[in-house]
Amino acid sequence: MLKRRRTFQAQEVGELDFSEELLELGVLIGSYRTARGIKQEDMAKLLGMSRITLSRIENSWLPLTMENFFKMAAIFEVRPEYLLQALARVTQRKWSRKGED
């Protein structure tokens, strides 16, 4: 028997809240930058943005574009999916604690 896939209505998708995941992604990016000894100002220059803009991304005040996400992965010398897997591990632990697996 095939499982029926649920289709989302546009309104439902618009109501989804990913703020926790975006916060975690910003923190993750900041952690990788710090662990690699890259100053915020230096990374911002590599990305073609101001240090303030990078700070706002790392603090989830501004969204991270896919283009900048891929650039960051290149700067960190990791595959983009590695960062996404790290994000998935963090959010999975949080969801498991909430009983939402």
Where in the sequence are the language-model features?
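Residue-level detection of the helix-turn-helix DNA-binding "recognition helix"
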Residues: T34, G48, N59-W61, A88
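Short alpha-helical DNA-recognition segment
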Residues: G37-R56
